[in-house]
Amino acid sequence: MSFNHQEIEKKWQGYWEENKTFRTPDETEKPKFYALDMFPYPSGAGLHVGHPEGYTATDILSRMKRMQGYNVLHPMGWDAFGLPAEQYALDTGNSPAEFTEHNINTFRNQIKSLGFSYDWDREVNTTDPNYYKWTQWIFLKLFEKGLAYVDEVPVNWCPALGTVLANEEIIDGKSERGGHPVERRPMRQWMLKITAYGDRLLEDLDELDWPESLKDMQRNWIGRSEGAEVHFNIDGTDEKFTVFTTRPDTLFGASYCVLAPEHALVADITTAEQKEAVEAYINSVKMKSDLERTELAKEKTGVFTGAYAVNPVNGEKLPIWIADYVLATYGTGAVMAVPAHDERDYEFASTFNLPMKEVVKGGDITKEAYTGDGAHVNSAFLDGLNKEEAIAKMIEWLEVTSAGNQKVTYRLRDWLFSRQRYWGEPIPVIHWEDGTMTAVKEEELPLVLPKTENIRPSGTGESPLANIDEWVNVVDPETGKKGRRETNTMPQWAGSCWYYLRYIDPNNSEALVDPEKVKQWLPVDIYIGGAEHAVLHLLYARFWHKVLYDIGVVPTKEPFQQLFNQGMILGENNEKMSKSKGNVVNPDDIVASHGADTLRLYEMFMGPLDASIAWSENGLDGARRFLDRVWRLFVQDNGELSEKITDAPNKDLEKAYHQTVKKVTEDYAELRFNTAISQMMVFINDAYKAETLPKEYVEGFVKMIAPVAPHIGEELWSKLGYNETITYASWPTFDESKLVEDEVEIVVQVMGKVRAKLTMSKDASKDEMEKLALEAIQDQIEGKTVRKVIVVPGKLVNVVAN
């Protein structure tokens, strides 16, 4: 008979809720373990089967660690600000707050139905004013430290929608919603100076237990480059511009310069003859995103300004072009071009027939750019030097002549932090009529997002908050000075940068987190989530954590000690699950048909946790069949415990049991859940063959399966006679000596041919082995003379007889 999953799951979920089984005390006697999931955005679509994969992994670890005597922090919350809720509100006329609350309730119920051992008393919600009070507080600290500033930045402006769009919301230069044209336009934006932490964000990666591939993604994103800045005067004017280059040794080979179309000097230096062409080009670039502009494969475009720069090292005049592959937001917005030794410059020079000059020997520049090392030529005081020597000598020359200097730059840009949206945290800043700007006082936080029916974009590039006069307009009570609140809101990243800290102390109204508690719980021991957050979320969270470390709020340099990216669950056809493809599997349906324990077991058994694997109904059915086999082995049809279960030991199962405890314990700790489950299946097969089942082994097995299938675990535990939950029962241990066989199989040969196989004690002496072997082959050697007996202890006996 199989078990009734609906009955059992409802019963134990009710028990856990009523008894607050997973409440985490802030005690310090036990060692701590902090298992964190990337909290979800509560979308209207609800949970999909990809969510529980990571959640089950952290839950297995959390449940095992509790049984091993750890105080476990395993929380859940909601990353609930963001564009989809605002979009839904615009489309339906409903409030984003109501929509979000409804979605959170759906998500919470779905997550509870899967039996995760979260401490729901610690639930956080980024849209709760009691939470975002502290998001705003962190912003104030950034502002005080000079790490939050206002700048004019080119953004994606959609005139038809009257709002700024993120790069992800644009497809082929048109808005994803409605297909309207999008243009680049400079706008006043809040920026966070993450670049000030570039070196620390890079260096501290070495101390983390993260996948190397993920660390490399962060390293590449930060993109530290060492080189030099070079100053170029513009011929016939007092103007100059600066370029950064990693190859100052090739300065003698520069044959033209390129400015970003948005560069401040372009309008001033363009000649009358070139004005029309330059303006037309600048307009054409407005429609392109940074991503499109810098694509390596795209055709090179550009236009000559009519102006010339002067090469500081030899006085040569270099034509100044503008081209879209140079971005105003990257580096200095200007490059010196050395087509003979740079691939992109080579393509551009080939397209526009610009001169090339070889300054490093080793290639054939009539065919391609040579980017390798070699002796310098045509380079005056650098001739004959290799790359490293020439770079050092040129930097020395630049610094002596004040034509440039040594410089380290980063690919990392400062973080564009403002959004022209309603549904986000208000930025706590006031702009006064006299042009000054002050932060809202700490005691006035939270600055609450006002309720409004009118969340349509303002059309001016400001957020919809600009429409709410009574909220926006303020008067300084002391001076009578008039001001306007900042109308931009924070991005969705803000609330997710620090949520792991709030779980530690979720109801503290006096501080972001209690210093003693944060000392107890940090760093997070394991953080599991999807690889799509490998760069931005983790980089932003690490940045904020380091700022909080600098001001004494947190005691560790890094937030997440170990990180793991789960793979993706694909549709049965190996395609990504999506509503449009109609291949989305809803976990509610599986919980109803097969049970939460089956879903959890199946998702952990599909394959390695970091692999992307296709969903399979057959696999799901197989997982259920295994749980049914476990149930039938231990429970009779009448619901009583199996009569095979006894207090007496059973030598036949001893090795299999201890092997299983060892492998499951080690595999769980290393996140190898699929192989741990395989081992439990092997044990169940052995247990079916055994005459009796020692109760100690049954209890040990139930403890091991409970982290994966907690409802069945609890039910079997209660049938074994326990009134308390299995949650805090002690984890089974194994005996190394029991993993070794006491007896071995010995091969007996006569003249090199196998004639018998014997089982004997592994410690049998040579004499004993010889005696037993000769007895076993008595009939084979009858009438023959035994000339010699070769004994290999523990392995074989070879008898030479003729």
Curated annotation (Swiss-Prot):
Positions occupied by motif 'KMSKS' region: 576-580
Pfam families: Anticodon_1, tRNA-synt_1, tRNA-synt_1_2, tRNA-synt_1g
Subcellular location: Cytoplasm
Any one Gene Ontology molecular-function term assigned to this protein's record: aminoacyl-tRNA deacylase activity
Gene3D superfamilies from the UniProt entry: 3.10.20.590, HUPs, Isoleucyl-tRNA Synthetase, Domain 1
PROSITE patterns membership: AA_TRNA_LIGASE_I
Top EC class of this enzyme: ligase
E.C. designation(s): 6.1.1.4
Gene Ontology CC: cytosol
Single GO BP term: leucyl-tRNA aminoacylation
Main location: cytoplasm
Binding-site residues for ATP, renumbered to this chain: 579
Entry keyword Cytoplasm: yes
Position of sequence motif 'HIGH' region: 40-51
Keyword Signal: no
Family per similarity comment: Belongs to the class-I aminoacyl-tRNA synthetase family.
Protein's recorded name: Leucine--tRNA ligase
Native source species: Bacillus thuringiensis subsp. konkukian (strain 97-27)
Gene label: leuS
